[in-house]
Amino acid sequence: MRVISGYLKGRNILGYNTPGTRPTMDRVKESMFASIQDYIDNSTILDLFCGTGSLGIEALSMGSNKCYFVDNGKEILKYLNKNIDNLNIKDKSIVTCSESLESILSSVPFILDTCQQIMSAQ
């Protein structure tokens, strides 16, 4: 795996093989980040089920200020922490090992134009 854009472009990301999981393919990352690239710069990112951190690292490479990485796999988070160290992004990374989340709450505003303001709020 590798970083596909931003200032870390071309840098390797350590992978981890575990049954039932697979890394996000480069073309999927390219499509995903192409659609949200205008919101990444100076943003704070939450990478749930982060694994080795491919998506959060990509966001940091593209200019995000901070990324919260959350996963329940203690072993895989060792690889994430190695990636964070190897890429020198520890100051922008917060890693949490959580066995479970009871709820994830998000209240979408009634006025959908407000979503744009929230996404671009600094």
Please provide the spans of the model-predicted regions.
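Class I S-adenosyl-L-methionine-dependent methyltransferase catalytic core
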Residues: 1-122
